[in-house]
């Protein structure tokens, strides 16, 4: 694989890659070294106005393109993403820190997502409703909602853009994304594939800059008709409130803190392999990452020992280095957060079984950590750690574990391990989550719904349900005269 040199990132406005009107830029830092590797354009109001005007004109053009032609263009983009997967993955690892193997999987998965949405967009149908008056015709028509404003996080720079972008394009909407300024190059490479595939100017736009300034300007703007956001629950609530104030549709994919219930009859080796792998993927910086491990007391010690062994078997290092299985945390803020989690765990009497400390002084490396005997009042059992920390607590009855899993206001994802169909039935009925994986790691395929309940948001970014928020349903009745 040829090495890819990291370059500066520009804005995408009206089909052109441009600097900010002010010339302002922001440093991009490699989390594995702590050193700047490039710069990204910092959009101001003048840039946003240009991007909004382009999104409006792009929408008027794109909505007129037949669904099968939109799908063909999207498939061309998917093919280009696959061709460029190695290069895009290297950009991602340099700016985000995850191992190159994980970055490449993310990019290749993006191509699958594009193709699935391209095909699903061809199946957006209206319907004919039998009239009560035989002289009338009643039809239901689906139309694109309009220009979309998207706001995406740094933990999955490509995946979190492509889900929103694909749903928007498949339904005939234009799309303007404020992507993360900490990880700008890989989202730009994704959008470049769409430009090169022939998506018309203005249909897609890309800006970076101050999150509060950009969101407070885009969401109320009359051009924008749909808002979609992935990020923390507190910020999501603010953006959802702003969208509601201006009657904009919104999809919110927010914080998780996923429970993992390991029942008495579980296959411990399977549970450790599946949940452990999911826990330390992307250094735990995953909204659906398993975080609260609720393990039956009869197997708790066995499970803890096995998870510690799994964690200690990970190779921590620069994501570009061969064999690395756990990369740097994305930014210094995560190091501070991890230190706080560990300090609190010790203070309340939990046991640090492995890890619990920063590795080295260069880069944002933190040891994979397992905490046992965690009290319910520990921070790690109440606030999403968003890092490589697994917290374990025992239980005696499955109903107790379910109650604890549901105790928090979050409800994005959940995991369970059991051989009993009765347990599966109970877990399926009782766990308050939008996504549940039993006896396996997370598999968020594009054809399955992806979203949460309670404070974890609303709306879906997968399955046929993902297209509905981008569509307007129009009722048309015509009387023959």
UniProtKB/Swiss-Prot annotation:
Keyword Membrane: no
EC identifiers of the protein: 1.2.1.26, 1.2.1.24
InterPro entries, per the entry: Ald_DH/histidinol_DH (IPR016161), Ald_DH_C (IPR016163), Ald_DH_N (IPR016162), Aldehyde_DH_dom (IPR015590), Aldehyde_DH_Superfamily (IPR050740)
Keywords tagged on the record: Arabinose catabolism, Carbohydrate metabolism, NAD, NADP, Oxidoreductase
Disrupted-gene phenotype: Cells lacking this gene are unable to grow on L-arabinose as a sole carbon source but grow on a nutrient-rich medium or D-glucose at the same growth rate as the wild-type strain. Moreover, both the wild-type and the mutant strains can grow on D-glucarate or D-galactarate as a sole carbon source.
Active site feature: 253 (proton acceptor), 287 (nucleophile)
Name of this protein: Alpha-ketoglutaric semialdehyde dehydrogenase 1
Annotated gene: araE
